[in-house]
């Protein structure tokens, strides 16, 4: 179930982006569209997850990544990967004020997942702009 909050975008459009993304890849465990201020716009986060906390953490991670790429003259941030023992987070900008955060399985084929997440981020950006 996807939740849309604080957005003027009708929920079915954003829900479809997240639904389609997870349908394309069994390696994507969850997905969320999060505004740069940390507000969760749409997500497949389980009910036991603290959406506010996840949003705040994701916004901080993206801000740090953007700052690091700028300071190190790497250009505009395109994606961030945070690796964990049991899975990875892949974060991509989905417009100037939104990011697509995905949790992916540890043994996922990253080439395919990155392409799918990139397409979904572009579609979300198109819908949000």
Give short role names for the model-derived ranges.
Residues 1-129:
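Non-catalytic interaction/Regulatory regions outside core domains
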């Amino acid at each position: 179930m996807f939740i849309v909050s604080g957005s003027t975008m009708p929920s079915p459009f954003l829900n479809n982006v997240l639904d389609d993304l997870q349908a394309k890849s069994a390696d994507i465990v969850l997905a969320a569209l999060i505004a740069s201020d940390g507000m969760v716009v749409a997500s497949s986060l389980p009910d036991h997850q603290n959406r506010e906390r996840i949003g705040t953490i994701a916004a901080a991670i993206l801000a740090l990544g953007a700052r690091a790429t700028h300071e190190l003259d790497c250009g505009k941030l395109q994606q961030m990967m945070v690796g964990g023992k049991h899975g990875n987070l892949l974060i991509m900008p989905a417009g100037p004020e939104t990011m697509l955060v995905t949790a992916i399985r540890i043994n996922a084929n990253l080439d395919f997942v990155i392409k799918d997440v990139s397409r979904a981020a572009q579609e979300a950006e198109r819908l949000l702009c």
